Regions:
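N-terminal pre-catalytic segment of deacetylase/amide-hydrolase enzymes
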Residues: 1-38, 44-53, 57, 78-79, ...
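Acidic-and-aromatic substrate-binding clefts and catalytic sites of carbohydrate-active enzymes
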Residues: 42-47, 66-76, 143-150, 172-178, ...
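His/Asp/Glu-enriched short active-site or ligand-binding loop at hydrolase and phosphoryl-transfer sites
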Residues: 148-189, 222-233
Length: 243
């Protein structure tokens, strides 16, 4: 019950052990303050220099969830992120982008999870070590591959001392959406929303969609923060059409 309330995970999801998403909002001091958080996943693949260049030019901060394998393969991208610590907070996305589900043969979106708790802990711990080695800062937040978790995984991650990073607006659906759809999703952003998008697929429409959508939010008076700057709370009024 407490885990469900803390993370806004459906009770039936915890009872059935099926993977669930964690939906969260920023804990704003005043509910209508136009503040939102942009989070970017760097799973595997490449480095979206166009997107990061836009964020630097516009001075828009973001929380980046990077895997060890992305860090190892994208020295240029890591160097750019590290050169702007005032904008980018780099957090743990795991070592090898293994979903946070436990049990032989368990999968999320066709990606195999962890056979046991020990493997999950290694995925989290080794990812954190890579982030700390690359940045000099120990991560506080963890977002699992696919952003879905089963109850055992959630408990294990939190027992390791990490905060589990959720979201309330899925901007690009794994960098698969077209520009206009991304813009439309960002148009739905409200005060306190946590946006999830991707920075590892430069061939996608994510950079163009985010650039247009984030500029529009700026015109509406929004400012952006990293997850280290503000507490989060369960998205109790989360609307399914917004993911």
């Amino acid at each position: 019950m407490l885990l469900a309330l803390a993370l806004c995970v459906p009770l039936e999801g915890l009872a059935s052990s099926r993977p669930v998403e964690v939906h969260q909002l920023l804990a704003l001091p005043q509910p209508e303050t136009p503040i939102a958080a942009l989070t970017l996943d760097a799973c595997g693949g490449g480095y979206d220099a166009k997107l990061i260049g836009f964020l630097i030019e516009e001075r828009i901060p973001a929380t980046v969830f990077a895997t060890r394998k992305w860090i190892e393969r994208n020295a240029e991208g890591m160097a750019m992120l590290r050169s702007h610590p005032e904008l980018f907070d780099i957090e743990d996305h795991g070592a090898n982008h293994v979903p946070a589900v436990i049990g032989p043969g368990r999968r999320v979106y066709g990606i195999t999870g962890n056979p046991d708790v020990a493997h999950l802990e290694s995925e989290v711990r080794d990812g954190a070590a890579a982030v700390e080695a690359a940045t000099g800062n120990a991560p506080r937040w963890y977002r699992g591959a696919t952003a879905e978790y089963d109850p055992r995984a959630l408990r294990a991650i939190m027992a390791m001392g990490y905060k589990v990073a959720g979201f309330s607006i899925n901007a690009d659906a794994g960098a698969t959406l077209r520009r206009d759809t991304i813009v439309a999703r960002l148009d739905a952003v409200r005060p306190g929303d946590i946006i999830i998008a991707h920075m590892n697929k430069p061939e996608s429409d994510t950079a163009e969609g985010l650039a247009s959508g984030l500029k529009s939010l700026r015109m509406r008076g929004f400012r952006f923060v990293t997850l280290r700057e503000m507490d989060v709370r369960p998205a109790l009024a989360f609307h399914p059409s917004r993911i």
